[in-house]
């Protein structure tokens, strides 16, 4: 018996040594690739700088001062050429990149596309598309022919896409010119923005704090003035959290309002909770103009992806003068947000009431159960798909907690969850989230379907059009905090689980009064609350947004509500 135990121990040691040696060699090879990619980015930035410098400084600064509508109109009139617009935004994006490390690649082909559009515009029969020549930034995971989509994995560098995604193809048809790609967290399953290939992207308001994720590069670039309109993706808040952290506006549509054929996913094969593209901009009205044109021409996507229904832009909903019924909440029952986020919702409530809308309390049911269902449906294989990919790569330090959790067998997590629950109930609950077998997975899917019915039933009972709520649990925290507070996505992931359209609009900033309330009133009942409280200290001046959500195919009602809040806050 002892002999077999010794053999078992020796075998385990031998396996560990073999695994460690192989991984060390792998990391050494990947470090060379990562350094090469970073060197290539430096050269790429300099090429973009040379292109930008071809434009007269005064002209460049004037073009850069135009807002989205002004630039679009100047391009339509021919007062600004497409090449001038691209060179101006190469310059602006370089400045933003130097401040935040937001860009992973400048799409140098943008100049060629701009030249072609300018040549076509000279033809007497040519009709300019509605977004002719407007520069467009793209999250790095979106497929652009000839460019990488690594999702922060070193192993995927130098594997460029062979064709544009349907959406990118559509954006080009509308006249938009993709001019750069922006940074993401490794695997996309985090609300920070760091990876071993391109490093950490910082918040334009405070470099010690994160810009959010996973569309963090977009949030940082737009927040720093480097782009007028960009495209992110969102599977748990990846558009909305960066918008909230960086003082920008964006929306995650319901799943089928954009085509998915030929796209990619952070975790393929999760049918009930899937990512969708979503626009991000400095303000809501830019998002509206973008979607009005994209959804006005949605047949382009539907013809190429039969699973994308031809649901056109509904101007009657967006422009309706009928007063809305709005349900609101400032605490979801799972994670109490810090004072500034609650204040932002209450101020938005007053703005909507002043506009004549009815705003009543709404209580989302059973959020603790929802958090379990969300993580179970996203990590439907217990995290093994992402874990297997990470074990073949350099692992980003800010996601090591998730990696450690995925490496622990589910049955061990279940056993450990009971003693953990005695001192840290919420962590104990999340440790029971991952599925053990297909029976539990089927149960989870059934529970999600039942929850959707329950939620919309409550909305219909009160005849609600939209929901108003916090965008997150806190303002932008330091870069290491998202990995320590993985459950901080409850306010956004709920609407991925429901497949609602949901957007974020900036409303206010953290005040000294908010910080005093944080110190004196914010709970410290468990480790997550303690971390959140500490991370929020010193955040005075950081932007705060609110979230608006509505059932599928009612994104125009979401945008209308967001726009009314924006007008009340900014006066324009």
Swiss-Prot record:
Task: Give the EC number(s) under which this enzyme is classified.
Answer: 3.5.1.99
PROSITE patterns documented for this protein: AMIDASES (PS00571)
- Disrupted gene: phenotype observed: Viable. Reduction (50 percent) in the frequency of motoneuron axon regeneration in young adults but not in L4 larvae.
The active site consists of 139 (charge relay system), 214 (charge relay system), 238 (acyl-ester intermediate)
Q: List each coiled-coil range.
A: 32-63
Signal peptide positions (record): 1-14
The UniProt annotation places substrate binding at 214, 235-238
Please name the Gene3D superfamilies in this protein's record: Amidase signature (AS) domain
User: What tissues harbor this protein?
Assistant: Expressed in the pharynx, some pharyngeal neurons, the posterior intestine and anal depressor muscles.
Q: Name one GO biological process term.
A: positive regulation of axon regeneration
Please list the reactions this protein catalyses: N-(5Z,8Z,11Z,14Z-eicosatetraenoyl)-ethanolamine + H2O = ethanolamine + (5Z,8Z,11Z,14Z)-eicosatetraenoate; (9Z)-octadecenamide + H2O = (9Z)-octadecenoate + NH4(+); (5Z,8Z,11Z,14Z,17Z-eicosapentaenoyl) ethanolamine + H2O = (5Z,8Z,11Z,14Z,17Z)-eicosapentaenoate + ethanolamine; N-(9Z-hexadecenoyl) ethanolamine + H2O = (9Z)-hexadecenoate + ethanolamine
Please name the GO terms that the record assigns under molecular function: amidase activity; fatty acid amide hydrolase activity
Which terms are listed as keywords in the entry?
Coiled coil, Hydrolase, Lipid degradation, Lipid metabolism, Phosphoprotein, Signal
Biological role: Catalyzes the hydrolysis of endogenous amidated lipids like anandamide (AEA or N-(5Z,8Z,11Z,14Z-eicosatetraenoyl)-ethanolamine) and eicosapentaneoyl ethanolamide (EPEA or (5Z,8Z,11Z,14Z,17Z-eicosapentaenoyl) ethanolamine), as well as other fatty amides, to their corresponding fatty acids, thereby regulating the signaling functions of these molecules. EPEA promotes dauer formation and may constitute a signal of high nutrient availability. Breakdown of EPEA may promote lifespan extension when nutrient availability is high.
Say which family it is in. Belongs to the amidase family.
Q: What is this protein called?
A: Fatty acid amide hydrolase 1
List the top taxonomic levels of the source: Eukaryota, Metazoa, Ecdysozoa, Nematoda, Chromadorea
């Amino acid at each position: 018996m002892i002999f077999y135990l010794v053999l078992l121990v020796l075998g385990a040691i031998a396996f560990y040594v073999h695994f460690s040696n192989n991984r060390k060699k792998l990391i050494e090879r990947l470090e060379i690739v990562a350094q090469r990619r970073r060197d290539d980015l430096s050269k790429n930035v300099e090429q973009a700088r040379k292109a930008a410098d071809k434009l007269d400084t005064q002209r460049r600064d004037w073009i850069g001062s135009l807002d989205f509508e002004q630039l679009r109109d100047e391009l339509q009139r021919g007062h600004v050429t497409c090449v001038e617009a691209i060179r101006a935004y190469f310059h602006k994006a370089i400045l933003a990149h130097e401040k935040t490390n937001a860009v992973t690649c400048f799409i140098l082909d943008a100049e060629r596309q701009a030249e072609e559009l300018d040549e076509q515009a000279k033809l007497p029969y040519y009709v300019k598309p509605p977004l002719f020549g407007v520069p467009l930034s793209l999250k790095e995971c979106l497929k652009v022919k000839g460019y990488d989509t690594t999702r922060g994995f070193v192993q995927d560098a130098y594997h460029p896409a062979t064709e544009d995604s349907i959406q990118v193809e559509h954006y080009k048809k509308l006249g938009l010119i993709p001019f750069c790609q922006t940074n993401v967290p490794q695997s996309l399953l985090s609300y920070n923005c760091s990876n071993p290939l391109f490093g950490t992207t910082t918040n334009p308001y405070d470099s010690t704090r994160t810009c959010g994720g996973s569309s963090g590069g977009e949030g940082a670039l737009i927040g720093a003035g480097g782009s007028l309109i960009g495209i992110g993706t969102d599977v748990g808040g990846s558009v909305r959290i960066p918008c909230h952290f960086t003082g920008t506006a964006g929306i995650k549509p319901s799943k089928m309002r954009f085509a998915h054929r030929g796209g990619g996913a952070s975790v393929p094969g999760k049918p009930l909770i899937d990512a969708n593209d979503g626009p991000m901009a400095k303000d809501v009205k830019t998002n509206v103009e973008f979607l009005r044109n994209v959804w006005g021409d949605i047949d382009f996507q539907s013809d190429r992806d039969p699973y994308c229904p031809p649901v056109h832009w509904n101007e009657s909903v967006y422009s309706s003068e009928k007063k809305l019924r709005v349900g609101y909440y400032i605490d979801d029952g799972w994670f109490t947000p810090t004072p500034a986020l609650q204040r932002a919702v209450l101020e938005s409530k007053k703005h909507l009431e002043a506009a004549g809308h009815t705003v009543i309390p709404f209580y989302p049911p059973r959020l603790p159960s929802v958090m379990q269902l969300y993580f179970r449906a996203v990590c439907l294989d217990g995290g093994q798909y992402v874990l297997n990919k990470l074990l073949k790569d350099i692992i980003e330090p800010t996601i090591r907690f998730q990696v450690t959790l995925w490496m622990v067998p589910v049955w061990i997590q279940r056993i450990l969850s009971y003693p953990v629950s005695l001192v840290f109930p919420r962590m104990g609950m999340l440790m029971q989230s991952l599925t053990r077998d297909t029976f539990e997975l089927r149960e989870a899917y059934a529970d999600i379907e039942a929850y959707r019915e329950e939620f919309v039933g409550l909305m219909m009972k009160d005849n609600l059009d939209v929901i108003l709520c916090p965008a997150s649990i806190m303002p932008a925290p330091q870069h290491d905090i998202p990995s320590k507070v993985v459950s901080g996505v409850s306010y956004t992931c709920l609407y991925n689980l429901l497949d609602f359209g949901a957007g974020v609009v900036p409303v206010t900033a953290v005040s000294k009064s908010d910080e005093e309330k944080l110190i004196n009133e914010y709970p410290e009942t468990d480790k997550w609350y303690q971390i959140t409280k500490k991370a929020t200290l010193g955040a005075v001046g950081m932007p705060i947004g609110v979230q608006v959500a509505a059932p599928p195919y009612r994104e125009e009602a979401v945008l209308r509500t967001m726009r009314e809040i924006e007008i009340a806050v900014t006066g324009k």
